[in-house]
Amino acid sequence: MSELLSFALFLASVLIYAWKAGRNTWWFAATLTVLGLFVVLNITLFASDYFTGDGINDAVLYTLTNSLTGAGVSKYILPGIGIVLGLAAVFGALGWILRRRRHHPHHFGYSLLALLLALGSVDASPAFRQITELVKSQSRDGDPDFAAYYKEPSKTIPDPKLNLVYIYGESLERTYFDNEAFPDLTPELGALKNEGLDFSHTQQLPGTDYTIAGMVASQCGIPLFAPFEGNASASVSSFFPQNICLGDIMKNSGYQNYFVQGANLRFAGKDVFLKSHGFDHLYGSEELKSVVADPHYRNDWGFYDDTVLDEAWKKFEELSRSGQRFSLFTLTVDTHHPDGFISRTCNRKKYDFDGKPNQSFSAVSCSQENIATFINKIKASPWFKDTVIVVSSDHLAMNNTAWKYLNKQDRNNLFFVIRGDKPQQETLAVKRNTMDNGATVLDILGGDNYLGLGRSSLSGQSMSEIFLNIKEKTLAWKPDIIRLWKFPKEMKEFTIDQQKNMIAFSGSHFRLPLLLRVSDKRVEPLPESEYSAPLRFQLADFAPRDNFVWVDRCYKMAQLWAPELALSTDWCVSQGQLGGQQIVQHVDKAIWKGKTAFKDTVIDMARYKGNVDTLKIVDNDIRYKADSFIFNVAGAPEEVKQFSGISRPESWGRWSNAQLGDEVKIEYKHPLPKKFDLVITAKAYGNNASRPIPVRVGNEEQTLVLGNEVTTTTLHFDNPTDADTLVIVPPEPVSTNEGNILGHSPRKLGIGMVEIKVVEREG
């Protein structure tokens, strides 16, 4: 209803101003600004819905000021361009309509009415209401009743007898199991669900709506609210260090806790969270690649579900035979948005909906088959009688190709339990949420029936039942939950450990690189993650007087304040204010100690603008002084005009990437020398090794042969035509996720370049 009212007010404002208000520059600008705000808010809501499937939620506040990178980002480029073009077109059309009668005399009354209607349209819009509520949640002091509802359980289970297998299905919400809405989509896993305790109304709350947040909520009984964006949790050294979570209790009770997934454990700090709370045995893409049957059988995120669940079964067998009490947690990935992935071993590879194939539904049907196969192996084993199997979604599905169909249904998270010791078949329609999952499992295992804000759905009362406005209540508790991190409020001295790549201050430890905004009573960490912008882009969003400490590779800050370090990949510390003074210090000891030294200086806005503009220069446009192309730093030498076909810098250098261009092409500002030696330090990837690699300058071509290890080769060129471009053509680029950023499409690697140098020859 509010959408219709908001749009009606918007339309009325446009029509009244266009036909009655007349000519006045101030009223035109004011009305266009407010109407433009209405458009921006609603496009933001549309874009947020596209990415999150949940409107402008808590995570979007962070994303509004940072780049969205990571999972399948290329899939979102076209919609993003469409939004920008649409926004420009709407603004242009809006301005044209409002100025239709600009030659008529100004009418104050109609101008005022149009402006008031425009303001009303903004106030009534759902986007404005959502943003207002989120901003309020950032500034609240907390809710006094938090302590009454947050309950710490006993640290042990008195007489543990059951092993636990806990399966997180990526985005595998219960809605998919509605056979009337989606016929024969989940027959195998749906049949198993119907054999156990099926909790049919598991609500998703703020702070539980992405993978690491869903894991924290289900194991600790609290939403993931932090002094930083949740998916950047990989930079912290401990995770809710004071809280008692399910893994802690199980470890204290004699369990060995295992976690197996196909993606990199570092993503979003899963490794930090699990190690902080009782898990000593973790297996992700790096740990599994040496043990899986086919280490090259991977999707954009890591190993496919069939591979991961096969490894989980092997681990279940091994642990069961040992007689050791254990828990085995696993997380699938094939159903990750926007499209999902199809394992090669499943029978259900294709699912049609609305008369055409749907990739997301196909991925769901395949993944549920793999999960069901894993569960049936456990059920058929002699150890099932001592095992509790839990299957849950980590969160509701985000915007995938099935999302518009899911939204037509009553959406809930998946949570069901199959007990080998005491088979129970029942559908429980009690109102609950993700935070109740851990407490319910703890209750089944013989422990307490509460865990944080979670309550057992078998013997307790969920917060979702106690509070009708549970979403608003959860946001009201946000400051209380953030305080559980015991995060420092000041930063005066700090220590950098180069061996561990960590910074420590005021009792807290963070992984490097790191950017910190430091104020009188708050230290705000801004880590670099797969979902955040590079730190220099985040720093560019700081206000002129904001105090910052930035710890990163020297070359990243050298172009601003320390050109002598432009080629250094060591750690450096920069601190100061963008509109004031900045200093850069080279970290030259294994254990390096520093102090903050912020000066209250006069702000220079010209300096501020120059710093911001320089920080926002994209990597390929950065230039440095050097007599060769050094590939392990961003940018290129000043003599290079442009280059293509080259991937991002890594610690050793850069790969060629045929996804960015079939050839490595380096164009210089001036013609290359008439006679020169080309000194190439490089290696080959895969089948490109020991094969002739054409290297061209103008009409002359030489052959380069590389091995899998780095070597230096000198090629001799004559350049009578004054060519200015160097071209290298890898013979057989290989599609691979090796060394790739998690969630990005595979790169096509050919040669790995460390350094290229042009040396003019005499004569």
Curated annotation (Swiss-Prot):
The keyword Magnesium does not apply. It holds the Pfam family DUF7024. GO terms for molecular function: phosphatidylglycerol-membrane-oligosaccharide glycerophosphotransferase activity. InterPro entries: Alkaline_phosphatase_core_sf, DUF7024, OpgB, OpgB/LTA_synthase_biosynth, Sulfatase_N. The chain crosses the membrane at residues 1-21, 26-46, 77-97, 108-128. GO terms for cellular component: plasma membrane. Pathway: Glycan metabolism; osmoregulated periplasmic glucan (OPG) biosynthesis. GO terms for biological process: glucan biosynthetic process. It is an enzyme of class 2 (transferase). It is a multi-pass membrane protein. It comes from the Bacteria. Its EC number is 2.7.8.20. It catalyses: a phosphatidylglycerol + a membrane-derived-oligosaccharide D-glucose = a 1,2-diacyl-sn-glycerol + a membrane-derived-oligosaccharide 6-(glycerophospho)-D-glucose. It is found in: Cell inner membrane. Disulfide bonds: none annotated. Belongs to the OpgB family. Transfers a phosphoglycerol residue from phosphatidylglycerol to the membrane-bound nascent glucan backbones. NCBIfam families: PRK03776.1. This is Phosphoglycerol transferase I.
